Swiss-Prot record:
GO terms for biological process: formation of cytoplasmic translation initiation complex; translational initiation. This is Eukaryotic translation initiation factor 3 subunit F. The keyword Lipid metabolism does not apply. It comes from Phaeosphaeria nodorum (strain SN15 / ATCC MYA-4574 / FGSC 10173). Its main location: cytoplasm.
Length: 342
């Protein structure tokens, strides 16, 4: 990943500004949520076969001083690109931006993305569009995120901001200097578990993976902790037996980790663990009960509708039969009267 690269931050002008308006020149740190990357990859998979790259808008949050940006959301923007020109649906971009900001008032426009690592004149045009005043990110710099989607290769991501350093007035609209800035893929424990579950499907032929239950997840987590403890124990034993080279940094890390362990009696730990297991079982039982009730309710509703329709048909049949019987009785009575008169 590109977040391991080294960067040199420069104070940069972002373009001509009116009197009293000062652009932000502080260094940037960009954090990217996994769901934004997944949306970009999904957009790339659904692109037309003759389209080399796709672009879209990045939404997220920005710190008060503008030095920290977190990319949380994104959406695709239609565009056509040839060797001579590029056309972006600006009306669609403005309408979608207004809808997203209405649905998520805490998010703001932070930049745009492209599924290609190439930076060309068209990239500068789009960058200037997102950095402009009014509908752009001014006075903050627009972040340009590139995500490589070459089949068979690792996914590489890079983030840039722009500055018109050395750009003449005639080329100011379609030229800019892209400056790389550090970034990281930020995810929590819940998202990490989801990513591990998704990545486990890559080794299967059907590319699918069943979702584990709470008990299975707990068992897997406990087994993972036991494996790590066994690994640490083997390392310490090898160091004591002079079979492995000691590391002062690793020893200090282990001491700090042990110092964070709470001083709790093993019996209390076992009791709390059993209580947690009982809570998990109760939640699982209640979830299954609710699922069963919903299924039973749907079946009863379907059965009631079916029985109601059958009763209605039966009632109509009885009514028709009664009418036919009455008509037959009247005809028989008429024949008897004519016979008597004769």
């Amino acid at each position: 990943m590109s977040e391991r690269d080294s960067f040199l931050h420069l104070a940069r002008p972002l373009g001509p500004a009116p009197v009293g308006a000062q652009p932000s020149t502080a260094p940037l740190n960009v954090a990217i949520q996994p769901q934004a990357v997944f949306s970009i990859l999904d957009h790339s998979l659904r692109r037309p076969a003759d389209q080399e790259r796709v672009i879209g808008t990045l939404l997220g949050t920005r710190s008060e001083d503008g030095t920290e940006i977190e990319i949380r959301n994104c959406y695709a923007v239609p565009h056509t690109e040839t060797a001579e020109q590029v056309e972006v649906d600006m009306d669609y971009q403005k309408q979608m931006l207004a809808l997203h900001l209405r649905a998520n008032p805490r998010e703001v426009l932070v930049g745009w993305y492209a599924t290609s690592s190439d930076l060309n004149t068209f990239s500068a045009l789009i960058q200037n569009f997102y950095s402009q005043q009014g509908d752009g990110t001014w006075p903050h710099p627009a972040v340009h995120l590139t995500v490589s989607t070459v089949p068979g290769q690792d996914i590489e991501s890079r983030t840039y901001i722009s500055a018109p350093i050395g750009v003449t007035a005639e080329r100011a609209a379609d030229s800019c200097l892209f400056i790389p800035v550090p970034h990281e893929i930020k995810y929590g424990e819940a998202e990490k578990s989801g990513l591990e579950l998704i990545s486990s499907a890559k080794d299967r032929e059907d590319r699918s993976q069943e979702i584990m239950t709470d008990l299975d997840s707990l068992e897997r987590a406990v087994q993972h902790v036991l494996d790590m403890l066994e690994r640490v124990s083997n390392y310490v034993n090898n160091v004591l037996d002079e079979e492995a080279e000691p590391s002062s940094a690793l020893g200090q890390f282990l001491m700090n980790a042990l110092s964070l362990a709470p001083k709790v009696d093993p019996a209390d730990i076992e009791r709390d663990f059993n209580n947690h297991i009982q809570d998990v079982l109760v939640v699982s039982y209640l979830a299954n009960t609710i699922r069963t009730q919903i299924d039973l309710s749907n079946r009863l509703a379907t059965a009631a509708l079916t029985m109601g329709g059958t009763d209605a048909l039966a009632g109509d049949g009885q009514k028709d039969g009664g009418d036919r019987k009455q008509g037959g009785d009247r005809r028989n009575k008429g024949r008897q009267q004519r016979t008597q008169e004769a």
